[in-house]
Amino acid sequence: TEKGVSYWAQYLEQQEIGKPQDVVEQENHLSYLLQYPEIGKERIDARISEIVTEIRNAFDAEFTPTEEEKKEKKQTDAILYLGYESYLAKENQLSLVFFETHETNGELSPHTQIQVFHFDLEKDAEVTAESLQSDSFAKNASAYTEKYFTTTEPYKNGIFGNYKTLLAPDAGRFDRFALTKDGVLFYFDRYDLFPGSYGVVRLTIPYAEMQKKIEEPKKETPVP
């Protein structure tokens, strides 16, 4: 349980809504240290429970020994860590962010899998990320992020790779976001744009920046 409490603690300050539910279980060589919120809305809570079950089932499938491995008595001791952040952007708009990390044979994976889900509290229903995006959403996010990461410490000295391609509007990195009181929060995976020492990188873009109209570059008239 100490491991679970330590893992969950890093997300506590970003839990704006929901009562944390802790699951600490062990089955044979697999352990589960899970935390998720109870919101108090029947259908949303049922969906959250379903998401946690899906994550758990995928973990089980990955680490359950095959028949061959069972014969050879090979198995991997594994722990599933699950933590969350929850953001209330407006009165009824909830963004729920799950963080999933695996530990195998005592080694903590350097990768954290991040999933974001959106809910309308008034309608007690899940909503799609697409329904929350304006036409210029990805373009504005791309322009702001590229400028921010290439001009701001400590990011400008760490960004690597072909970041213009990686941060292009259609590259998929702006499909995963949370809506907060301050703006749109994007998560960039460890090792994606920066060295591993940066960890998971978060960037909140103010709503005013996300709503700007982007002018198309003017075509220059060739000189005769």
What is the predicted function of each stretch?
Residues 1-224:
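Compositionally biased intrinsically disordered regions enriched in Thr/Gly
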